[in-house]
Amino acid sequence: MIQTPRELLNPRYTYHTIFSDVCKTRFNHLVTRLFFICSIIQTVVISLLALPHSPLWELALAFIPNILALNLVSLLIIVTRKNYMHVKNFGFANSLTFILGQLLSVKFLVYQGVYSMGSILLSFVLGVVFGRGGSGWKPYYKLFIWLVVPTIYNLQHHVTDADKLSFNCENFFQAPQDYVLERVKRIMEKSVILSVISMFVLPIFTTVFFSRQKSGLFDSFTNGVLAVTNLLIISCIIFITFEFINIAFDAHMSIGCLHKGKLISNLSSTPMETLLSGLSADKPFTRLTAYQELAYRATSLDPSLRAPIYHSKFRSSSGNTWSLILNECLKTIQINNEKVVQYLRSVQDLGGSATARHKKKVENLDYMYENGKLTSANERLFGNRPSMMAPLRDNGLLDESPNRLRVRTDDSVLLNRGNKKRHRSSYYDNDLDETTQTFNGSIFTHETTFMTAMRLMLKKLKNSIMSFIFPSYAERQSSDESDNYRLLPNGSNKAQISIIDIWSISKKRQAEKLVPLPICHANSVVALTGLLIRSKTEDPKGGIIASVGDILKTLERSICALGEFADWDPESMAYTAFQTQRTAQDRVQQDSEDEDSMKDTTDMISVLYQLSTSAFMEIVLEYNVALNDVYLDADVAKLANWFLEVYASGNPNAT
């Protein structure tokens, strides 16, 4: 396990502690400043609108209670948001399970109560202007305010996963006022749409709750245009208030890595050690912000922000500042690559003949992984060593020429360096004897989790009956069950696909499940690329330049792994073998020829694939001449040469 200086720091200087204090400050500013001022403004406007209908002394007496009621609404919502706020994706494989998981939860009930209370309080404050329902339609007014409006907003809140804070790798800081102003138009449009939907939903609720009432009650209500208009306006104001509170909360919680113009790690007396503790933090929000700061330092126009990385005097048993930063970034990238590859292996076609298994060329994934895990080797910290033996990929035959020097491509960069040595024979067995599989094989060839569970349940029922009738049968039951339950997904070599996945496979949701925190991956790529390019002129003799080979190697493997997922089409699960077994160069070249495939990047893994490709190209173009003196992996050199040829030919569409 890669060690970080987190344990060497005073607990109050860790990134998580400092960032927690910053979040508390932002939350307090949100409550005591923004929402308090907005409550006063809302109360003043409502009092002015109600002045023709109510006496001045009555409005004066209601002024303070109205402010407290409006403040209570905002406080209820943001406290609930704080408790359920998250930055990682939940990991649902498709939209159906996502919606069911969101709606069938305690969180949905909590929000239902919060929004119902908020709707009642807002209607009480607005009642001085729009009234609180006449004698003829008061039951419908209560139903609309207490149930319809909060339910509609709660449904859209959970379906859109409004509790998740969204970030991008382009903006590392955004002022809250700018965040809110950019979304004012969307707030208004969304509120109007939800208000109209609520009016159409109201008859359904009235049919359910007032089915035994006389029809004349509903007729007298619907025939009053003023009553319907009042409900429409009240619901719109309530939706605007709810949406503004949620947007303001998002704006203050997603400000970024700056606090009062300073980087969060600079609030500590040991900035680099604090930053490193954030990169390896357990809390996702802390890690995300730390990677934001690292990318901000790497791309900033101010070289003083990168000077501590170049010249930090901090050293530990695991290395200096840069080596620890490099370890964390490559670790983040490679873990995501491994998850993607393991998933693609899990949906492989289980078929394949013994003859075909010797004829396919495995150019990418198998040299990185063995049995779904990153391979390891006793390699140096930076760079790779050539090996006299390497897995052969041509016609399944080993090249026994002792004078042929081949490049080893099965070692992982800076990961699993302390693992035990593997058996070499198992690697060759994978290439020669493993059943050839395709990533887009029909999922109906798999035994689903549902069918496996049903089979085991029936067998357990049979064992129970047999044990009751024949007591001696019980002696074998426990051993049989332990053997049978190995067939479940967690202990199986056979890929298990849930029955819901058969009905509805969402590539976007699957990408969110595989890479739940893509912004950390993206900021890792941005940070490594920025530091490599900036250090060429700012620190030409430093250690960052020496790691260009390892970074290019990791990016090339990302292009292979993430590119496989970008090419994967769950709607047509029938790719040919040559479409799935391609090198990174083949993958990038076809994507450059097919503009549509580059534009259709709705899932985050495809976006990360394009980002990795762009970063690889930018580094290669920047280090063009210097790469001649750097040892490069064979696949890295091949892809780099192809990029340079394309760039020299002046074909912009190819890149």
Swiss-Prot record:
Phosphoserine: modified positions: 401, 412
Pfam families in alphabetical order: Ndc1_Nup
Biological process per Gene Ontology, one example term: spindle pole body localization
A single Gene Ontology CC term: spindle pole body
Membrane spanning stretches: 34-54, 59-79, 89-108, 110-130, 191-211, 225-245
Note from the entry: Present with 3030 molecules/cell in log phase SD medium.
Name of protein: Nucleoporin NDC1
Organism classification: Eukaryota, Fungi, Dikarya, Ascomycota, Saccharomycotina
Recorded name of the encoding gene: NDC1
